[in-house]
């Protein structure tokens, strides 16, 4: 691991990258820092190789897939996930972490699955941006509900063995965990509640 010493304790802080090709990178960097990680941006292969874990932010999943290819990160990222690198994806990040993407986009510009979590995810399942919504939902492992902000959000339609459902909204799966990989259909990085990011940072250290 590339963990760095934490000046507040003897426990090293995990170095968590945020994929910074497109999407709400800055909000995740702030949330991870407040959750106790050493947060850095990832745009190049050498930066991907230097982190202990990766956050794939919200944004546009087809654009992010295109940029992963352009920056020659798609296959190296798939390889690191297959090797067990912890990862957290929010919204578009959840879509990309799936093994199967439903309604993946127009031919030639599809969102490409990274195959990190054994699940099938439907893009924009809750509707267009004008149909975005928010609300409080129970979240397994947290002591109270989280305020979830959904923006053109996906939902999970299938999970494989070993995938734990952490939250649902309107009967649909919107948060899952498999091993040291986490995914949410909503955006905890925009609310000021750092518990989901703290959960992930703790997972990285497991």
Curated annotation (Swiss-Prot):
Organism domain of life: Bacteria
InterPro entries, A to Z: Class_I_gatase-like (IPR029062), PdxT/SNO (IPR002161), PdxT/SNO_CS (IPR021196)
Active-site residues (renumbered): 91 (nucleophile), 187 (charge relay system), 189 (charge relay system)
EC number: 4.3.3.6, 3.5.1.2
CDD domains linked: GATase1_PB
Record GO cellular component, one term: glutaminase complex
An example Gene Ontology biological process: pyridoxal phosphate biosynthetic process
Described function: Catalyzes the hydrolysis of glutamine to glutamate and ammonia as part of the biosynthesis of pyridoxal 5'-phosphate. The resulting ammonia molecule is channeled to the active site of PdxS.
Family to which this protein belongs: Belongs to the glutaminase PdxT/SNO family.
Subunit note: In the presence of PdxS, forms a dodecamer of heterodimers. Only shows activity in the heterodimer.
Protein name in UniProt: Pyridoxal 5'-phosphate synthase subunit PdxT
Source organism (scientific name): Mycobacterium sp. (strain JLS)
Gene name per UniProt: pdxT
